[in-house]
Structures are given as C-alpha cells and as structure tokens.
Amino acid sequence: MATEQTAITRATFDEVILPVYAPADFIPVKGKGSRVWDQQGKEYIDFAGGIAVTALGHCHPALVEALKSQGETLWHTSNVFTNEPALCLGRKLIDATFAERVLFMNSGTEANETAFKLARHYACVRHSPFKTKIIAFQNAFHGRSLFTVSVGGQPKYSDGFGPKPADIIHVPFNDLHAVKAVMDDHTCAVVVEPIQGEGGVQAATPEFLKGLRDLCDKHQALLVFDEVQCGMGRTGDLFAYMHYGVTPDILTSAKALGGGFPVSAMLTTQEIASAFHVGSHGSTYGGNPLACAVAGAAFDIINTPEVLQGIHTKRQQFVQHLQAIDEQFDIFSDIRGMGLLIGAELKPKYKGRARDFLYAGAEAGVMVLNAGADVMRFAPSLVVEEADINEGMQRFAQAVGKVVA
C-alpha cells in the first residue's frame, strides 16, 4: 500500500527489491475471478494465473471465507504443536491419492527439497550409503535452493554458485534409452515432471513414464514426480500421474494447492516416510493453519467432477483460439500441453521473441506467460469462464498482430 509520503510505482521496485525479477511495467492491485486491475484502473484478463497458482481465480469467495474464518481463530503454532486444518488437509490428500503420509511445506522448492532428501535418506538407511545417484532431466525445473536447482536441468539457473551437490545426472527428457544407459543399483531416485512447465510445456509420453517406473522397480530406486506446476487439477485429473496410470513413490505439490496462498506438500507411502524420524526434516511455517485452511477449501472445489471435467472443454476453447491465431498470422509450430497447461511454440522466424508477445499481451489487456524464449504458456484459472476465454484470446490475437506487423 502506498504511504502518504511516497507513492508506490514500478520504479519503486528497482529501488528496493533485489534485481532477480523483471516485472511488467504495471502493478496489479485488485483481482476478481479471471480479471485483474492495475493502479490506473486498467483491466486485464489473467491467463497466467500467477504461474499456475490461482487455480480458482482471484479472491474466490470460498477461499476468502476460509482465510477470514481461520484468521479470526488461529494463525500459527509451529510444528511443536499440530493443528486441525493441517490434519484435515492431510487426510483429504491421502484419501484422494496413492499416498499414506504427507509433509507440508511453503513452496515448491521446499517440497522438492524434502523429496530429494527423503529419497537419499531412504536409500541410505534401507539399502546402502553409496546409493546416492539422482537421475533428472535436461530443461527440468525443480526450484531455486542449491539442491533443487542442481537437480533441475538448466545450467543458466544453477551455474555460478560454487560447488553443486554431487551425484546428479541429467539426461534428455522422454529418452528412456538415455536413462537406461546411466541407471544402476547406485541410483536412489529418478526425478521427473510429468509435464515440464518451465522447460517449454513438454509432456512426458506414457511409455516414458511407465519405463521409468519399471527401471526404478528393477534397481530399487524411488520414482519422484514433481507435480508442482502440473498437479492439482491442471491436467483435468487431480494429479497428472492419474492420467498416465503410473504411480510414483513420492509426489510434490504446491502452486495451485493453496489457490494463491503459499503452501506445498510432499506425498509418499508409509514405508518410505518411515525412513525419516523426529528431526530429520522440518519447517517452522510448514502446515500452518492459515495456509492449510485455504488449501482445504481449494481442494474441496478442485477435486470435483464439475471442475475436473470442465477443464477439457476449456482447453479445447483455448486450442481453437490458438489455431485461429496461427491460421491468421502463421506464428506457431506446435500447440501442446495437457488440460489448462498449454504451450504454443513459436516458429523459427519468431525464435527468441516470446517475451515480446507477453509484453504486447499486457498492453492489450491480457496476462500470459512464456516458457523459455520460444514458447508462449497459458495457465489460467481452472474455472475460467467461456466469455473470459473468448475475450482474452481476442486481446491476445490483437497483441500478436501488433508484434508481427
């Protein structure tokens, strides 16, 4: 909120925040559903969703009520004590998935850090202290801590911070032969996003994930699914593993889990969880009542046939608009993804210009994302209305027209 002494503008960002982001020139101040307004009152249609976070749009009444109600009851206890919202949310996740145990954290990075530590510790105590190899994939993204950014397969994020955690191997995504070539009995885990979000909205093939499951079983390694971006209804199933019919040993969830309130979770089986003991891992804020109350309300809405089945129809509407834009301007070489995580790859003549289309979209009143320099990404609310899709994509078409003119 602006103070009486100093007005808050985009320039304020450059004066007070570390230069690790390059935010848009406008500052959003209000949101409702799939609409956002900036300081000047300009309206935007939001197809970015806070990077696949605001799964029920902005200020959904059920989430607002959950936050208000819990905010008047209990905010924080730490994990010296437990709390009802965390236990209720944990039960909901376990009842709806393969998991038997859950640990709450605050971000996707923390959930993945937990998963990777557990995978290595489980291998150490159940098998051998030398079973430490983690196999991950090129162009993957698993977070920003030193461990998670090292497991992620993008040197632009991991280089320049000194020695990295050892025994992490990266191979091409969707290449089962490459995995077989490096996998052995020293492998503790294979870590994969069923859909690489930051890596260009690339979906794994069913054969690839099933092959990973078989290899993990053969070598007594754990299969870890990072569903931070593609989980919680984004694909049209509650979690992407359900679409593929491949069950992981560990699954991580964040982003849409809280509908905009920071919360994450690592899900696993009782057997694997038992490798941890009191003090093995933890978080001061993880599983706090405010976050879990909001996440519980979001879960109750997302995990319904009405919402999950509607995602497929909404996806088709987006794809039809993108196909029409491509017919008019000839800019996309591929339209891909799953559910409401959609990628549109730019043709070679527009290579490297995804940010140009993003900025033009904002100017036209629509918020979109890029996934690398060559892919436009759409991750709207799972309950975005048809009218918002139509109007927002019309605005995006206008933006495309200006860029290619």
From Swiss-Prot:
It holds the Pfam family Aminotran_3. Its cofactor is pyridoxal 5'-phosphate. GO terms for cellular component: cytoplasm. GO terms for molecular function: identical protein binding; N2-acetyl-L-ornithine:2-oxoglutarate 5-aminotransferase activity; pyridoxal phosphate binding; succinyldiaminopimelate transaminase activity. Keywords: Amino-acid biosynthesis, Aminotransferase, Arginine biosynthesis, Cytoplasm, Lysine biosynthesis, Pyridoxal phosphate, Transferase. Binds 1 pyridoxal phosphate per subunit. It catalyses: N(2)-acetyl-L-ornithine + 2-oxoglutarate = N-acetyl-L-glutamate 5-semialdehyde + L-glutamate; N-succinyl-(2S,6S)-2,6-diaminopimelate + 2-oxoglutarate = (S)-2-succinylamino-6-oxoheptanedioate + L-glutamate. The modification N6-(pyridoxal phosphate)lysine is found at K255. N(2)-acetyl-L-ornithine binds at R144, S283. Pyridoxal 5'-phosphate binds at G108, T109, F141, D226, E227, V228, Q229, T284. Its EC number is 2.6.1.11, 2.6.1.17. The reaction catalyzed by ACOAT is highly reversible. This enzyme may also transaminate ornithine. Involved in both the arginine and lysine biosynthetic pathways. NCBIfam families: arg_catab_astC, argD, PRK01278.1, PRK05093.1, PRK12381.1. This is Acetylornithine/succinyldiaminopimelate aminotransferase.
